[in-house]
């Protein structure tokens, strides 16, 4: 710290540690951790971002001895700190460090796929630098189990972001085949779930593959610019042309027309509409 005249006071040699890339606690490690158990996570973040030295074994010993104190922290504070950790450079360094990885998984066991960041190719790394917390979290928690549900139950995430994560989770819980990512199939997903959800499932696949896939990249570019698909037949049209009264029947007819339109790659003829309405 410095006084009002700018004179530096450094009783713990912090300046020297900073110059040497050594991350340590100011004062007694055990005492500082017990003052605020969130400092365990902050240590991991600072170590991942600034350290040029290996962990001090005594520091790690104190971190592990106090790990149960994390349970005393609010979920909001834990999530806020996780958001600060969820930067691509931090995640990459953390996931490559065995000790840091072990500790963060004790605190956030739901981050099952965090090691994905240890081996990113250049293209994926550059892409993820531009991405947001929700997509990064999805990469870490989506698997074939109920892991996502547990994470969303445990932490207070907005309804909108919960839906976004669940869209990715639900998509990849289905059986993935060679036809999953053809344009006809993705068009249907785009229609029902929208642009953001479609780009999420495509980019998720690209990151998991961790290699250049030209067809997937072309799909991403296509759906970044694709206009929304709008069903051409409306209730007013059916009421006027076919004299169908407003109510349950018109809803049923519209649903069947929509299903036919989607099935036919978003095309439907007048004859097909006639057939559905008159049967």
Q: At which residue positions do the language-model features occur?
A:
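Glycine- and charge-enriched loop/helix tracts that form the active or gating conduit
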Residues: 1-148, 153, 248-249, 253, ...
């Amino acid at each position: 710290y410095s006084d009002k005249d700018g004179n530096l006071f450094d009783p713990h040699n912090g300046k020297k540690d900073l110059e040497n890339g050594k991350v340590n606690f100011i004062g007694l490690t055990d005492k500082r951790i017990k003052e605020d158990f969130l400092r365990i996570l902050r240590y991991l973040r600072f170590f991942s971002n600034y350290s040029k030295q290996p962990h001090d074994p005594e520091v790690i010993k104190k971190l592990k001895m106090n790990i149960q104190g994390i349970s005393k922290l609010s979920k909001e504070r834990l999530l806020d700190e996780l958001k600060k950790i969820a930067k691509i450079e931090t995640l990459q360094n953390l996931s490559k460090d065995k000790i840091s990885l072990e500790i963060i998984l004790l605190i956030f066991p739901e981050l099952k796929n965090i090691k994905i960041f240890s081996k990113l190719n250049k293209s994926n790394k550059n892409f993820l630098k531009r991405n947001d917390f929700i997509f990064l979290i999805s990469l870490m928690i989506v698997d074939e189990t109920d892991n996502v549900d547990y994470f969303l139950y445990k932490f207070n995430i907005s309804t909108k972001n919960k839906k976004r994560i669940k869209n990715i989770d639900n998509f990849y819980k289905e059986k993935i085949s060679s036809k999953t990512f053809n344009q006809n199939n993705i068009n249907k997903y785009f229609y029902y779930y929208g642009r953001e959800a479609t780009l999420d499932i495509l980019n998720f696949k690209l990151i998991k593959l961790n290699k250049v896939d030209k067809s997937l990249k072309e799909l991403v570019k296509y759906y970044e610019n694709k206009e929304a698909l709008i069903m051409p037949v409306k209730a007013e049209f059916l009421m006027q042309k076919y004299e169908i009264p407003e109510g349950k029947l018109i809803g049923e007819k519209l649903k069947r027309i929509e299903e036919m339109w989607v099935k036919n790659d978003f095309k439907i003829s007048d004859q097909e509409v006639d057939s559905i309405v008159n049967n």
